[in-house]
């Protein structure tokens, strides 16, 4: 298939944790709210005047320092983040909010705070730790609401003057929903015998929305969606349609490797909340 117009642009956003859109948003005076886990509600991190960026550690090499502090028993992702933080790779962040959904991730962020690895030269920088409910019932909802208020809304307002009114929250939710609509619409082109987008391309596009200011991506996502409507698909050349399931992965080459063997990744629960419905035709 003909290359997508903005694919290289999306790929380049994934090359560095501090990508060009983060720099652009901060030059506009916006606050960078870093996070490390999907249990942190993204819309609340993208209130007017702020934007979210999920921390990554692209091209990680040695993790000796992080392993010293966390041992080799903890997952590579948490150690890679700590290693990059020690190297000074996240000093662009204005705050870091993390949930306790994963002990390893929590420990990584605690080490960042103890080692003063983030926030150099930023007097307003803060760390916040959320308690995540284990049950989706009324008590769990009340706890989650309280945690979001105490560890996201209030700190952002008190430290940076971010508007946390209902109107501001609804605006952020609307923007988040628009991103979700575009991603779902783009993902629809993975269906059918001759899909118009590869699993690798979809992974790259989806991941870009996690690591860059969303409002700066909407126009390119809309253009990509329009482009797919008229994109000529390849003749069926894959041997099987594959659903990949597991923990989140931010290594797009992993999906590319699978597709290079002749498979087609039509759905992946490693980086999206795809439902494996009948239309995806999983083999």
Task: State what each model feature region is.
Residues 181-269:
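Extended, H/D-rich, highly charged conserved domains that either
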Residues 271-276:
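Conserved small/polar residues in nucleotide/adenosyl-binding loops
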């Amino acid at each position: 298939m003909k290359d997508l117009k903005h694919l290289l642009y999306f790929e380049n956003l994934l090359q560095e944790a501090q990508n060009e859109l983060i720099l652009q948003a901060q030059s506009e005076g916006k606050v960078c709210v870093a996070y490390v886990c999907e249990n942190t509600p993204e819309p609340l991190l993208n209130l007017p005047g702020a934007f979210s960026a999920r921390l990554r550690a692209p091209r990680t090499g040695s993790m000796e320092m992080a392993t010293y502090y966390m041992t080799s028993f903890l997952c590579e992702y948490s150690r890679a983040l700590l290693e990059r933080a020690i190297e000074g790779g996240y000093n662009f962040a204005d705050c870091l909010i993390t949930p306790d959904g994963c002990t390893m991730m929590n420990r990584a962020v605690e080490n960042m705070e103890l080692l003063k690895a983030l926030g150099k030269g930023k007097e307003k920088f803060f760390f916040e730790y959320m308690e995540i409910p284990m049950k989706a019932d009324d008590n769990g909802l009340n706890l989650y609401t309280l945690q979001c208020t105490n560890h996201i809304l209030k700190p952002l307002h008190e430290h940076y003057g971010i508007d946390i009114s209902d109107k501001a929250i609804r605006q952020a939710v609307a923007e988040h929903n628009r991103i979700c609509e575009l991603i779902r619409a783009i993902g629809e082109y993975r269906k059918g015998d001759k899909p118009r987008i590869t699993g690798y391309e979809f992974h790259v596009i989806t991941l870009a929305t996690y690591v860059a200011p969303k409002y700066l991506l909407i126009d390119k996502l809309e253009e990509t969606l329009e482009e797919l409507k008229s994109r000529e698909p390849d003749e069926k050349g894959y041997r099987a349609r594959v659903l990949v399931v597991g923990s989140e992965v931010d290594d797009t080459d992993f999906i590319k490797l699978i597709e290079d063997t002749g498979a087609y990744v039509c759905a992946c629960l490693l980086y999206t909340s795809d439902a494996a419905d009948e239309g995806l035709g999983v083999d």
